[in-house]
Structures are given as C-alpha cells and as structure tokens.
Swiss-Prot record:
UniProt GO cellular component terms: ATP-binding cassette (ABC) transporter complex
SUPFAM superfamilies membership: MOP-like, P-loop containing nucleoside triphosphate hydrolases
Lineage: Bacteria, Bacillati, Bacillota, Clostridia, Eubacteriales
Keyword Lipoprotein in record: no
Name assigned to this protein: Spermidine/putrescine import ATP-binding protein PotA
Subunit (UniProt): The complex is composed of two ATP-binding proteins (PotA), two transmembrane proteins (PotB and PotC) and a solute-binding protein (PotD).
Described function: Part of the ABC transporter complex PotABCD involved in spermidine/putrescine import. Responsible for energy coupling to the transport system.
Leading EC class: translocase
GO molecular function: ABC-type putrescine transporter activity; ATP binding; ATP hydrolysis activity
C-alpha cells in the first residue's frame, strides 16, 4: 500500500435487507486529501462514509488504516471524527461546553481543555461566542460549532456527511470556501459526502462519483467535469447534451448525419458511440449545410447567461451563451473539436 494512503477500502461489499448497496468497492484515501463522495441518493456514498467511521462493518472485504485491518474496530477506537447534517449539538450546553464535551469525557485537565477549545474556536472563526446558547446561533454558526467539536480532538480524518444541506444557498457557498481553507490549515484528511455537484467541484482535491454501489469515476474536479468516462458521469456532473454518434475514423465523428472533428481516437470505424457536449461549449451561428441545423424553441435569461434550447432532428439541445435568440430562429450547432467528448456505448450501461 502506498505510504501516503491513510485509509483503504479493499473489495468491500455491504448489503442491507438483502439489497446490495456497495459492490466490491476499492478506494484509497490519501493523507491531507479533501476527497468527496458524490452521487445520487442510494448510491452508497453515506454507507462508505459510515464504514470508514466504524458505524458499519463490511460483509465482504476489509478496511485498512495505514495497512492495519480496522474492519471490526469500533468508532471510538479510530482516529476519526464525524460531522453530520444534523449537527447533534447539546441544546443545554453553551458553545464552549459543546466543543469541550469530548475532551471532558477523556478527563483532560481544565487548562489543556481550555487551550484546545480556544484553538478550535479560532480555527472556525467563533472567538467571542463561547458563552452563547446553541439556540442563539445561526445555522452557519451551529455548523461551525459542530466542526469545532470534531476537530478539537485532533483527528487524522474528518468525515462530513452532507453538513451544508440545511443551509441556504448563499451561506452554503460561503461555507464551501471556509471548509476548504480549514482543511488546508489543519492539514488533515477530509472525506466529504454530498449529492451537490457544485460542492464537490468547488472544494475537492479528488471527486469519487458513485452510482448503484459502484465507483463510476475517480479524479480531480477538472478531470471529472471535462473528461467524464461514461454517460452517467457526464449527465450527473452538470448539464450535458448526450447524443448518439458514429465514429467514421480517428478524430472524426458523425452526429445527425453531419461530420464533426474531435480529438478522441481508438474507436472502430463506424462504431456507434455516445457523444457528450457541454451546453457552454456550443456556439450558435447562421444555418450551414455542413452543420446540424435547428430551430430555437426557447431562450431564457439566467443571470450570467442565456439558456437556449434548439430542436434538431427530434433532439433538443441545451446551450448556454451570452447572446439572446428568438424562438423560431434558425441556427446551426457549432463545436470545437476538443469540446466533443466520445464514449463507448457500453460505458453508458455501467451508470444505469
């Protein structure tokens, strides 16, 4: 096992009531990494988190911590802390007492507890809130208390199960940057669970996209967004136009009877493929006999861009651009070669 791998799930399978939720999953989590488990409800991401935390045991496979098998080790014996969506703060205790609770259970002396709590308060920007009651705090402040209570124990790994889910959009976006900054300052490993693609792309060093208990793709946010390995990932990570194409040769794909240059190679001649094109990568120009032509069906202003829908041969394209178009207007679909992503048809089946 690599020296910088702190946790490895190796060939892990987990079922509940005869329903398999994780299927022979293998995953490495590295030191000081911000790793996000991303996927729809029921994909197995929270179960994976609970296995790392010791709240569940694998039916098959093992969980290793620095090479040591911890599959049956209870949570309190793991150097791991968890922050849940429901923060589970003690309403009868103030901020200081909530953060200090775990340290008191360990019977640390008061001066050391005070030192550690004050450090945690500084790290989450809550200095001056020590004596506040929990019901006097905003949602964002309560979340900071929950994080402080977790990091005050100085865990090697912090698990976060959709901790921003209860916050409003603006506060959620602010907390994304705060969490990423905090992780870098602490120098510890974060394993974060979310179904929110923006959260995953904004904060993570590594994103693990899951579906039906299987890892679909693991990579940097840029890799996941720009080079999805199958149609599920392409569709789940932001909007995508996914159409059927035919590879005529390396670097040439036919879409709706029109030929486009692309950069993908290694496909058989005349092989049917899935073609993925992001809405922001499409340019709408005057109709052309060499391009796919269609008619604008709608154009909606979204603030930073217009969302334009164009119908061509029974398929409705979604395009994001800065120009307004009129419904009924005739246009052509134009895409640069490096913005056309080709995937094997069989890879779409893996994500369904």
């Amino acid at each position: 096992m690599e020296r910088n791998v702190v946790i490895r799930l190796e060939n892990v399978t987990k079922s509940f009531d005869d329903q398999v939720v994780l299927k022979n999953l293998t995953l490495d989590v590295r030191k000081n990494e911000f790793l996000t488990l991303l996927g729809p409800s029921g994909c197995g991401k929270t179960t994976t988190l609970r296995l790392i935390g010791g709240f569940e045991k694998p039916d098959e496979g093992i969980i290793l911590h620095h090479g040591n098998d911890i599959s049956n080790l209870p949570p309190y014996k793991r150097n791991v802390n968890t922050v849940f969506q429901k923060y589970a703060l003690f309403p009868h205790l103030n901020v200081y007492e909530n953060i200090a609770f775990g340290l008191k259970i360990k019977k640390m002396n008061k001066s050391l507890i005070k030192e550690k709590v004050e450090k945690a308060l500084r790290q989450v920007n809550l200095v001056g809130y020590e004596n506040r009651r929990i019901d006097q705090l905003s949602g964002g402040q309560q979340q900071r208390v929950a994080i402080a209570r977790a990091i005050v124990n100085e865990p090697e790994i912090l698990l976060l199960d959709e901790p921003l889910g209860a916050l409003d959009l603006k506060l959620r976006q602010e907390m994304q940057y705060e969490l990423k900054t905090l992780q870098k300052e602490l120098g510890i490993t974060f394993v974060y669970v979310t179904h929110d693609q923006e959260e995953a792309l904004t904060m993570s060093d590594t994103v693990v996209v899951m579906n039906n208990g299987v890892i679909q793709q693991k990579g940097t946010p840029e890799d996941i967004y720009n080079e999805p390995v199958n149609a599920f990932v392409a569709d789940f990570i932001g909007e995508s136009n996914i159409v059927e194409g035919i590879m005529r040769q390396d670097g040439v794909v036919e879409i709706f009877g029109r030929v486009y240059e692309c950069v993908d190679k290694g496909f058989a001649v005349n092989e049917k493929v899935d073609v993925v094109i992001r809405p922001e990568d499409i340019k709408l120009l005057e109709p052309s006999e060499n391009k796919i032509n269609g008619q604008v069906t709608s154009c909606i202003f979204k603030g930073v861009h217009y969302e334009t829908c164009v119908m061509t041969d029974g398929f409705e394209w979604v395009i994001h651009n800065t120009k307004s178009f009129t419904p009924g207007e005739n246009v052509s679909i134009n895409v640069d070669p490096f913005d056309i992503h080709i995937m094997k048809k069989m890879e779409k089946e893996a994500g369904t």
